[in-house]
Design a protein with these regions (language model features):
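Core catalytic lobe of class I
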Residues: 1-239
């Protein structure tokens, strides 16, 4: 059969890939659902089942209406194997969504230390003044009673259950400019969380944020199974 011929062709190639792969290296094999289960058996034999890492689902296209008797095929599989334990792997993160940026990071800080809320137009356009930093604020109150963390800081009273941080940590955060002080002593000190210091959500084994190449894309070279640069970048950055 065509599948047997394909697997017979793939087996020696996978063995050679395993041979030349560095001890810290990994293999990512892209395949569609018609062959992924057969290829996994081959890879388990070549790499060892203990070196299987993930079966990544890549959502490469949106749902279409040409499938009448089954669910439309919108995803492919990427089988991820390591050469052996100790392979290089770097956790990947998604970029922040527009909703996260709009709803959570609504303050700006300027080089002179002044801060203000973003305007409606700035939130809608996501265009902010040069050299400004976006941040949001986090409560510094302890969720549980902490008698040892009930102290006044720079004239500001502690929250009812105490601070979340020790006095030494408060001083360090203050030196780093990460405390936002209220206009009056009746307010509460807040922690500044800068956008440029926050990673997005951790990427899991279902990738929905990388679309397939379209004919209008500049990077398209005409190769039928060409992969998007964003897909290759994620794999390279991860391993």
């Amino acid at each position: 059969s065509n599948m047997m011929a394909y697997l017979t062709m793939m087996a020696p190639r996978l063995k050679e890939l395993h041979r030349v792969l560095k001890p810290t290296g990994s293999l990512y094999l892209h395949c569609d659902p018609t062959a992924s289960h057969y290829l996994k058996v081959l890879l388990d034999m070549v790499f060892g089942a203990e070196n299987f890492s993930n079966a990544i689902t890549w959502k490469r296209s949106d749902t279409h209406n040409d499938a009448k008797k089954q669910f439309p095929a919108t995803s492919d599989h990427i089988l991820f194997y390591r050469k052996k334990a100790g392979n290089t792997f770097n956790t990947q993160h998604t970029v922040h969504s527009e909703r996260t940026l709009r709803d959570w990071y609504s303050y700006l800080e300027f080089p002179d230390g002044t801060t203000r809320r973003m305007t409606k137009i700035e939130k809608e356009t996501q265009v902010i003044p040069p050299n400004s930093r976006r941040f949001n604020t986090a409560d510094m109150a302890s969720p549980n009673p902490r008698p040892n963390l009930m102290f006044e800081y720079k004239g500001y009273p502690h929250p009812p259950k105490g601070w979340r941080f020790s006095l030494d940590t408060m001083k360090k955060l203050d030196e780093q400019g990460k405390l936002l002080f209220p206009a009056s002593n009746n307010g509460r000190i807040m922690f500044k969380r800068y956008l440029d210091e926050q990673a997005g959500a951790t990427v899991g084994d279902v990738w929905t944020d990388i679309s397939q190449l379209r004919s209008s894309m500049v990077e398209r070279m005409g190769y039928p199974t060409q992969k998007p640069l964003a897909l290759l970048e994620r794999i390279i950055n991860a391993s």
